[in-house]
Amino acid sequence: MDRFSASHRKRRPVEFSEPERRRQFGWLRHNATGLQIVAEDLRSGRLWPNERTRMMNDGTIVSSPDAPGPGLSAAIEVAHLTKFYKTTLAVDDVSFRITRGSTTGLLGGNGAGKTTTIAMIMGLVLPSSGRIEVLGCSMPRQSAEVLGRMNFESPYVDMPMRLTVRQNLTIFGRLYGVENLTERIEKLAADLDLGEFLDRANGKLSAGQKTRVALAKALINQPELLLLDEPTASLDPDTADWIRRHLQTYRRQNGATILLASHNMLEVERLCDRVIIMKRGRIEDDDSPDKIMARYNRATLEEVFLDVARGRLQEGMQ
């Protein structure tokens, strides 16, 4: 018998029509409107009908028993996290715990499950099963209580092109309820060398400038937890190194926790205290970069990554 008791299985599941299911559990874009919808649904109880629920493969929602929460020393804890997209298994029974103040990299190829894992941690994608705790709160049930303490950055998420940098940052700052917002925007502009671009339309910025604006958006609320998806993708080496150094400075000065998904092995080696290697939705290894390279007798994470991709881990360990 699985962990869901017979009494829970006998309960009548909460059922939604297909259009309603798509509305409630559709893949929300990470923008102001999407986050407001999540927060409003969570406050009203519309998003999660019960305190603990599970989505079955056919989309029906059934109750599951409460699980004990972790201590507050963890920034993120996921247990047996699984995600199906119809019949495709995107994330397969993933468990890990990330301590506060650390930088952890999710390393893996396309389709490894990195972005889906981050989206579930944020509460933007509903897990099929498993438990997620973020900053001491159960996700996504308690998302409204924790969203203001975390943020997300990705070069693949565009902000309105016609709005100026200042207008975009103001929208996100108001969404997060940032106090003294004008001063906060000016400080970020100074820290990230954006002063001369504040009143320029986002659509007129270069790729590197847009990345700095995206980072400013991610730091607008001084998050305790920063989630990054390919933060330096398509950037020249100098700009990418500048972004990495600023992230390191922010973590040191604020005691923040960073979780990043990346294909960039050098970036992970330089930024991360710990690496979680994923393949086909499962965790292949989880340790510090140095220990992983030593264990598989490889000089770089890139060599380890290629071994994982080509199924040669056992050969590397011999």
Which residues are covered by each model-predicted region?
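Catalytic Walker B motif of ABC-type/P-loop ATPase nucleotide-binding domains
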Residues: L226-E230
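Conserved ABC ATPase signature
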Residues: A201-L205
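Conserved catalytic motifs of ABC-family nucleotide-binding domains
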Residues: Q222
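Helical segment within the ABC ATPase nucleotide-binding domain
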Residues: D241-Q253
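ABC ATPase "signature
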Residues: D286-D287
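Conserved ABC ATPase "signature" region
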Residues: T170, R174-F197
